[in-house]
């Protein structure tokens, strides 16, 4: 048995089927995994649903608890005891996994001999999930130096022997954050922890109603669990210096991503604040003060208040931090926040620096193809600075080549009161061979020596072009296409520059006007103003100005008048190969439809007969296609 899946179930009749369906429909063969469902004395039809799946699928196991435990810990422990799999995966009854998750998880873990493997999480219906640790796949991450402490949920693949040999179970004496205690204990005993970030393994779903993560928990239970984690770190085999750093990492997580975040604001009464502060203080005093030097500055300031038993100061500070723009200024290239709550303490300037908390808030209002450029319009401000200070920023557009990391800079065409317009000239972006490839767009903002750069595009108005829309241009070396698009994972603006050899076109013709149209289907192509069709007749090259360009999301139509072409070819007495190109002979047009025949003109001409009598003969000028080529026939 490769994997045992553990699901604690309590009153999940509306949710459990979606979860189980994702588990029984895996690409991994069913004989390789088991699904252990532990019903915690449900009062709805959950148990009946579980038994239906058990009857239908041989790899579904159902355990019925006789007494409700009040939490998922005890049911999970029951399942661990009977699990037959080499690995154990914990799944909540209101979540589900990707169809390839088990096979990928197992193969990756076996290949890397992992004790624990974190599979990439995905939030559904607005459910927030940890992301920082899933930026790249890493078969061997460091517990202290990585971001994995920021995900302490049990939705991971654990080696069964790791849990059983080290007697790692979910604590049942606490009813809050028991999964964090379990996961930290497993982290501390694991010899190798891996991260697989190339597939959405586990889907956490935000449901209507109250989720355990946001339900009220008494402070003594919550901070009791936090003290258990600190105790586990202290008792671990880590070197003392690494223990201190790990506790600091945990404190960063705790204050920014737990119930303690802005705790004095969440508590509505003085009595609640005092009670929570008492247990918070007890927890913090269990952490050695040496850890304080390794936490983030805003966490260090909180610890200052807590270690000085200053609830009033912490309350004032957390409110001031919510309104940080009032207190933040730019000083010698640094963002400094001078909070009144800190005036009674002797604080170094270094602790007041908040550069790391700032980010550029941006919104793309419009992206527009315009002649030979792409117009990029939007707004951008510094999150921590007020409107008046933001008015002083200067902007630079930066294109960074994804492979070579080369950079190209453009000044804004206009900038006023945080609203910008950049004109990206395609010919400047694609001027040499080394420019081929993907260019990622950034905006860099600077104020009084302080600089910050951000990727742009993931917050925007609707993009009005199709994913195939491109600009077709040329330089002295080659013809190129420039296609703006938004990246897959982060949804930011990039431009893909590629060499372009030819474009397939269908033909249509208006006999009366002598208008010939080239129809490029499944493409929206933008061209420079005053574009032309180049015609190579074999003896000469003729330029036909583009009379009209009709653009639709999935079609481009170029129309030219061919009267001058007909005049030049009037002397042709036999079929001749001709070539069409756009703006340069390198940018060829090929015939998309084979054996197409278009009559360009019909004339009556005088011919001598064998009896030396003149005779009027009707002749046709035709444009033919064959094997992607064009032919002129008289």
From Swiss-Prot:
Instruction: State which pathway it belongs to.
Output: Cell wall biogenesis; poly(ribitol phosphate) teichoic acid biosynthesis
Against Gene3D superfamilies, the record matches this protein to:
Spore Coat Polysaccharide Biosynthesis Protein SpsA, Chain A
- Annotated catalysed reactions: 4-O-[(D-ribitylphospho)(n)-D-ribitylphospho-(2R)-glycerylphospho]-N-acetyl-beta-D-mannosaminyl-(1->4)-N-acetyl-alpha-D-glucosaminyl di-trans,octa-cis-undecaprenyl diphosphate + n UDP-alpha-D-glucose = 4-O-[(2-beta-D-glucosyl-D-ribitylphospho)(n)-D-ribitylphospho-(2R)-glycerylphospho]-N-acetyl-beta-D-mannosaminyl-(1->4)-N-acetyl-alpha-D-glucosaminyl di-trans,octa-cis-undecaprenyl diphosphate + n UDP + n H(+)
The keyword Hydrolase belongs to this UniProt entry's keyword annotation: no
Biological process (GO) annotations held by this record are:
cell wall organization; teichoic acid biosynthetic process
Q: Which InterPro entries match?
A: Glyco_trans_2-like, Nucleotide-diphossugar_trans, TarS/TarP_linker, TarS_C1
Name the keywords, alphabetized.
Cell wall biogenesis/degradation, Glycosyltransferase, Teichoic acid biosynthesis, Transferase
Q: What happens when the gene is disrupted?
A: Deletion of the gene abolishes all WTA glucose modifications.
Q: What GO MF terms are annotated?
A: poly(ribitol-phosphate) beta-glucosyltransferase activity
Q: Which Pfam families match?
A: Glycos_transf_2 (PF00535), TarS_C1 (PF18674), TarS_linker (PF22181)
Q: What is its EC number?
A: 2.4.1.53
Question: PANTHER family this protein is in?
Answer: GLYCOSYLTRANSFERASE, UDP-GLCNAC:BETAGAL BETA-1,3-N-ACETYLGLUCOSAMINYLTRANSFERASE-LIKE PROTEIN 1
UniProt similarity note: Belongs to the glycosyltransferase 2 family.
Function of this protein? Attaches glucose residues to poly(RboP)-wall teichoic acids (WTAs).
Q: What is the designated name of this protein?
A: Poly(ribitol-phosphate) beta-glucosyltransferase
According to its UniProt entry, this protein's organism is Bacillus spizizenii (strain ATCC 23059 / NRRL B-14472 / W23)
Lineage of this protein's species? Bacteria, Bacillati, Bacillota, Bacilli, Bacillales
């Amino acid at each position: 048995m490769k994997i045992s899946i553990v699901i604690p179930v309590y009153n999940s009749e509306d949710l459990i089927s979606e979860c189980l369906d994702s588990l029984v429909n895996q690409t991994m063969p069913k004989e390789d995994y088991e699904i252990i469902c532990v019903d915690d004395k449900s009062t709805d039809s959950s148990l009946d649903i579980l038994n239906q799946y058990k009857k239908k699928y041989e790899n579904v196991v159902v355990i019925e608890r006789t007494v409700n435990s009040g939490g998922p810990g005890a049911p999970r422990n029951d399942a661990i005891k009977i699990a037959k799999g080499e690995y154990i995966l914990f799944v909540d009854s209101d979540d589900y996994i990707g169809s390839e998750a088990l096979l990928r998880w197992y193969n990756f873990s076996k290949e890397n001999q992992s004790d624990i493997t974190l599979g990439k999480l995905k939030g559904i219906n607005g459910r927030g999930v940890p992301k920082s640790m899933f930026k790249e796949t890493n078969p061997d991450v460091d517990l202290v130096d990585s971001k994995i402490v920021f995900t302490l949920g049990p939705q991971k693949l654990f080696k069964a022997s790791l849990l059983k040999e080290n007697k790692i179970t979910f604590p049942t004496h606490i009813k809050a954050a028991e999964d964090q205690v379990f996961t930290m204990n497993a982290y501390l005993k694991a010899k190798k922890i891996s991260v697989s970030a190339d597939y959405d393994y586990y889907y956490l779903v935000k449901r209507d109603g109250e989720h355990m993560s946001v339900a009220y928990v008494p402070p003594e239970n919550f901070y009791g669990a936090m003290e258990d984690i600190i105790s586990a770190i202290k008792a671990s085999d880590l070197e003392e210096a690494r223990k201190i750093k790990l506790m600091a990492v945990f404190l960063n997580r705790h204050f920014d991503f737990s119930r303690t975040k802005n705790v004095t604001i969440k508590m509505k009464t003085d009595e609640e604040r005092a009670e929570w502060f008492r247990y918070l203080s007890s927890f913090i005093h269990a952490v050695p003060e040496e850890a304080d030097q390794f936490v983030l500055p805003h966490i260090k300031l909180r610890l200052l208040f807590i270690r000085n038993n200053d609830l009033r100061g912490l309350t004032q500070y957390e409110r001031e931090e919510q309104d940080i723009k009032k207190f933040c200024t730019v000083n010698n290239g640094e963002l400094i926040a001078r909070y009144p709550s800190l005036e009674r303490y002797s604080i170094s300037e270094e602790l007041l620096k908040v550069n790391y908390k700032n980010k550029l808030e941006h919104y793309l209002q419009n992206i527009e193809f315009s002649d030979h450029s792409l117009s990029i319009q939007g707004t951008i401000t510094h999150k921590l600075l007020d409107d008046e200070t933001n008015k002083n920023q200067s902007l630079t557009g930066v294109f960074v080549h994804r492979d070579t990391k080369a950079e190209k800079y453009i000044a804004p065409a206009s900038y006023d009161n945080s609203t910008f317009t950049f004109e990206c000239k395609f010919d400047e972006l694609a001027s040499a061979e080394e420019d081929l490839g993907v260019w990622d767009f950034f905006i860099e903002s600077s104020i009084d020596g302080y600089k910050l750069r951000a990727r742009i595009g993931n917050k925007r108005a609707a993009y009005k072009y199709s994913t195939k829309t491109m600009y077709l241009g040329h330089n002295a070396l080659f013809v190129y296409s420039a296609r703006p698009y938004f990246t897959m994972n982060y949804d930011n603006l990039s431009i893909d520059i590629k060499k372009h050899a030819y474009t397939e076109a269908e033909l249509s013709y208006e006999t009366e006007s002598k208008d010939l149209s080239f129809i490029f289907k499944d493409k929206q192509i933008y061209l420079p103003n005053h574009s032309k069709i180049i015609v190579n007749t074999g003896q000469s090259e003729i330029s036909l100005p583009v009379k009209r360009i009709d653009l639709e999301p999935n079609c481009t139509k170029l129309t030219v008048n061919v009267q001058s072409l007909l005049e030049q070819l009037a002397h042709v007495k036999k079929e001749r190969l001709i070539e069409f190109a756009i703006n340069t002979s390198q940018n060829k047009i090929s015939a998309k439809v084979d054996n197409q025949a278009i009559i360009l003109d019909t004339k009556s001409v005088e011919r001598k007969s064998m009896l030396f009598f003149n005779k009027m003969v009707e002749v046709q000028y035709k444009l033919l296609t064959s094997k992607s080529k064009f032919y002129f026939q008289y």
